[in-house]
C-alpha cells in the first residue's frame, strides 16, 4: 500500500512520492520561545513526530527541519514585562521546550534552525522579492504586494475580503493594499534589530520560515506541516514569498493538524482551562499524554479531557501488562518492522486510532501466545508497533512504578511494606496483611500477587 496523505493544497488524499526518490524533506513550524509550551503546541509536535518515524521506516533518507522562532514581538513584550534579557528568555524557554517534548517521547528534528541565525538569508530573499516587483519599501518597512501574485490565496481558498479579516491586518498609510503583509519592519533602539538596506530593523514572522526552509531543504521540498491555525496567514504567506522569490514551486504536500479544545471548550486562560505541557506532566506520564493525543485522527479537532487521559493510562497499563508477562523473553530478533496492518493504518493518512486498535489486538495475541518463539515473535511485533507511534519504550516495571505523587510512598517504603506483608502472611496474620494492602491502595499503590511473588504498580 502506498503512503497517502491529506494535502491541504488539493483538499484530497494524495499518494505521496518523494521529489527525489528515497529522500524526503519535511519542514514543520516550531515554537516561538517566550514561555512554556501549552498542550495546543504539543499536538503538532506529536503528530509530525509520528509522521517522521513512519517516513524513516519507509525511506532511507529523511531530513526533518523544525525551526525555533527566537525573534518576535511576543518575546519583546515578555522581555519588557519581566526585565529579563531577550537572549536569556529564548535560551531558557527553548531548553524547557526540549525538556517537555522529550518527556512526550518526541524525537529531535534533524535540523533545528533559529531565526536569528538566518537574518542574512531573510534580507537576501526580501531583496529578490523587491527586484522582481513582488515587494516594496515604505517608511522603513518592506511589504509583500499581494496584488502582484496572481494565485495568492490558493492554500486557504479565501476571498480577498476574508483574507483581510482573517489576518487582522494593520491599517497603515504606507500600504498600497490593505492585505499587503510585512517582510521587514524598523526597530527602535530598545528592540532587537539588524542593519539592512532599509535601515535597522527585524524580520516579519512569515519571511523567517521561508528563508530557513530554503536554507535547509532547498527551493522545492516534499512536506510542510503545522497546526490548522497556520493555514492563513502564515502558510499562505510563506507560499507567496517562496514561490515569488525563487520562481519555483514551494512545498508539495501541506499537512495540518486540527484544533485543540479542552473539555469541549476553546482553551483559554480566562476560562481557567489553559494547561501547559508541564502542568500535565506533573499529573501524568508523558507517554499517556502522547497516547491520548493519538486517539483522535490528526486532521480532526481534538478534545482534551481528563477522562481521555485516564483511558490512555489504562490502555498503557494493559499493553505494559502484556509485556511484563514476557519480560524474561528476548525479542531482539523480531523487533525490526511493525506488522503490515499497523503500517497500513499509518500509511493511510496517519490513521493513529486504527493503529492503536491494532496494538490492543497484538497485546491480546501476546497474552495467549505459547512457546518461546511465538512469545518472542509477538512481543517483537507489539514493541515495533508501539515504537512506530513513539510508545512502549519503557521497561514494564518502570512504567508501573512510575514517579508517583509528591506525597506518595517511595519505592523503598513500598518494598518494605511488601516485605512486612509477606511476613504477616507467613505468620498467618491475615488481618495485618490486608491492612498493609489497603494502606498502600489508599496511597495509590496496587499490589498484585502471582506465582513469582508480589509485584506493585502506582494506580
From Swiss-Prot:
<comment type="similarity">
    <text>Belongs to the class-I aminoacyl-tRNA synthetase family.</text>
</comment>
<dbReference type="InterPro" id="IPR009080">
    <property type="entry name" value="tRNAsynth_Ia_anticodon-bd"/>
</dbReference>
<keyword id="KW-0030">Aminoacyl-tRNA synthetase</keyword>
<feature type="binding site">
    <location>
        <position position="29"/>
    </location>
    <ligand>
        <name>Zn(2+)</name>
    </ligand>
</feature>
<keyword id="KW-0436">Ligase</keyword>
<dbReference type="InterPro" id="IPR032678">
    <property type="entry name" value="tRNA-synt_1_cat_dom"/>
</dbReference>
<dbReference type="GO" id="GO:0004817">
    <property type="term" value="F:cysteine-tRNA ligase activity"/>
</dbReference>
<dbReference type="GO" id="GO:0008270">
    <property type="term" value="F:zinc ion binding"/>
</dbReference>
<feature type="short sequence motif" description="'HIGH' region">
    <location>
        <begin position="31"/>
        <end position="41"/>
    </location>
</feature>
<dbReference type="InterPro" id="IPR056411">
    <property type="entry name" value="CysS_C"/>
</dbReference>
<feature type="short sequence motif" description="'KMSKS' region">
    <location>
        <begin position="266"/>
        <end position="270"/>
    </location>
</feature>
<dbReference type="GO" id="GO:0005829">
    <property type="term" value="C:cytosol"/>
</dbReference>
<feature type="binding site">
    <location>
        <position position="234"/>
    </location>
    <ligand>
        <name>Zn(2+)</name>
    </ligand>
</feature>
<dbReference type="GO" id="GO:0006423">
    <property type="term" value="P:cysteinyl-tRNA aminoacylation"/>
</dbReference>
<feature type="binding site">
    <location>
        <position position="209"/>
    </location>
    <ligand>
        <name>Zn(2+)</name>
    </ligand>
</feature>
<feature type="binding site">
    <location>
        <position position="269"/>
    </location>
    <ligand>
        <name>ATP</name>
    </ligand>
</feature>
<keyword id="KW-0862">Zinc</keyword>
<keyword id="KW-0648">Protein biosynthesis</keyword>
<keyword id="KW-0963">Cytoplasm</keyword>
<dbReference type="InterPro" id="IPR015803">
    <property type="entry name" value="Cys-tRNA-ligase"/>
</dbReference>
<dbReference type="Pfam" id="PF23493">
    <property type="entry name" value="CysS_C"/>
</dbReference>
<protein>
    <recommendedName>
        <fullName>Cysteine--tRNA ligase</fullName>
        <ecNumber>6.1.1.16</ecNumber>
    </recommendedName>
</protein>
<keyword id="KW-0067">ATP-binding</keyword>
<keyword id="KW-0479">Metal-binding</keyword>
<comment type="subunit">
    <text>Monomer.</text>
</comment>
<keyword id="KW-0547">Nucleotide-binding</keyword>
<feature type="binding site">
    <location>
        <position position="238"/>
    </location>
    <ligand>
        <name>Zn(2+)</name>
    </ligand>
</feature>
<dbReference type="GO" id="GO:0005524">
    <property type="term" value="F:ATP binding"/>
</dbReference>
<dbReference type="InterPro" id="IPR015273">
    <property type="entry name" value="Cys-tRNA-synt_Ia_DALR"/>
</dbReference>
<dbReference type="Pfam" id="PF01406">
    <property type="entry name" value="tRNA-synt_1e"/>
</dbReference>
<dbReference type="InterPro" id="IPR014729">
    <property type="entry name" value="Rossmann-like_a/b/a_fold"/>
</dbReference>
<dbReference type="Pfam" id="PF09190">
    <property type="entry name" value="DALR_2"/>
</dbReference>
<dbReference type="InterPro" id="IPR024909">
    <property type="entry name" value="Cys-tRNA/MSH_ligase"/>
</dbReference>
Amino acid at each position: 500500500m502506498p503512503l497517502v496523505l491529506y494535502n491541504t493544497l488539493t483538499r484530497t488524499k494524495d499518494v505521496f512520492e518523494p521529489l527525489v526518490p528515497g529522500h524526503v524533506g519535511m519542514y514543520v513550524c516550531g515554537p516561538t520561545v517566550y514561555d512554556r509550551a501549552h498542550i495546543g503546541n504539543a499536538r503538532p509536535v506529536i503528530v509530525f513526530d509520528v509522521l517522521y518515524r513512519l517516513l524513516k521506516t519507509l525511506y532511507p533518507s529523511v531530513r526533518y527541519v523544525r525551526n525555533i522562532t527566537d525573534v518576535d514581538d511576543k518575546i519583546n513584550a515578555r522581555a519588557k514585562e519581566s526585565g529579563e534579557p531577550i537572549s536569556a528568555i529564548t535560551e531558557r524557554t527553548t531548553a524547557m521546550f526540549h525538556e517537555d517534548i522529550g518527556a512526550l517521547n518526541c524525537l529531535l528534528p534533524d535540523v533545528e534552525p533559529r531565526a536569528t541565525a538566518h537574518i542574512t538569508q531573510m534580507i537576501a530573499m526580501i531583496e529578490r522579492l523587491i527586484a522582481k516587483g513582488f515587494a516594496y519599501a515604505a517608511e522603513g518597512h518592506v511589504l509583500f504586494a499581494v496584488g502582484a501574485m496572481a494565485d495568492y490565496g490558493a492554500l486557504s481558498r479565501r476571498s480577498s475580503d476574508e483574507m483581510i479579516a482573517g489576518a487582522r491586518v494593520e491599517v497603515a498609510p504606507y500600504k498600497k493594499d490593505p492585505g499587503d503583509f510585512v517582510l521587514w519592519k524598523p526597530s527602535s533602539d530598545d528592540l532587537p534589530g539588524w542593519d539592512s538596506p532599509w535601515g535597522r530593523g527585524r524580520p516579519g514572522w512569515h519571511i523567517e520560515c521561508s528563508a530557513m526552509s530554503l536554507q535547509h531543504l532547498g527551493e522545492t521540498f516534499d512536506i510542510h506541516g503545522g497546526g490548522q491555525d497556520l493555514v492563513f496567514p502564515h502558510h499562505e504567506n510563506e507560499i507567496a514569498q517562496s514561490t515569488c522569490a525563487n520562481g519555483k514551486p514551494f512545498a508539495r504536500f501541506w499537512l495540518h493538524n486540527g484544533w485543540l479544545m479542552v473539555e469541549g471548550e476553546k482553551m483559554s486562560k480566562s476560562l481557567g482551562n489553559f494547561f501547559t505541557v508541564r502542568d500535565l506532566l506533573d499529573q501524568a506520564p508523558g507517554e499517556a499524554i502522547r497516547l491520548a493525543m493519538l486517539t483522535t485522527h490528526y486532521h480532526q479537532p481534538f478534545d482534551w479531557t481528563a477522562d481521555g487521559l485516564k483511558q490512555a493510562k489504562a490502555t498503557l497499563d494493559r499493553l505494559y501488562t502484556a509485556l511484563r508477562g514476557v519480560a524474561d523473553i528476548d525479542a531482539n530478533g523480531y523487533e525490526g518492522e511493525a506488522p503490515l496492518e499497523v503500517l497500513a493504518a499509518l500509511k493511510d493518512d496517519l490513521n493513529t486510532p486504527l493503529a492503536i486498535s491494532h496494538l490492543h489486538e497484538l497485546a491480546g495475541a501476546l497474552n495467549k501466545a505459547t512457546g518461546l518463539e511465538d512469545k518472542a515473535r509477538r512481543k517483537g511485533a507489539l514493541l515495533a508497533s508501539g515504537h512506530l507511534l513513539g510508545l512502549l519504550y519503557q521497561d514494564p516495571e518502570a512504567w508501573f512504578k512510575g514517579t508517583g505523587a509528591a506525597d506518595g510512598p517511595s519505592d523503598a517504603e513500598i518494598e518494605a511494606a511488601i516485605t512486612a506483608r509477606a511476613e504477616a502472611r507467613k505468620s498467618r496474620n491475615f488481618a495485618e496483611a490486608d491492612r498493609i494492602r489497603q494502606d498502600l491502595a489508599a496511597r495509590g499503590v496496587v499490589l498484585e500477587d502471582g506465582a513469582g511473588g508480589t509485584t506493585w504498580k502506582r494506580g
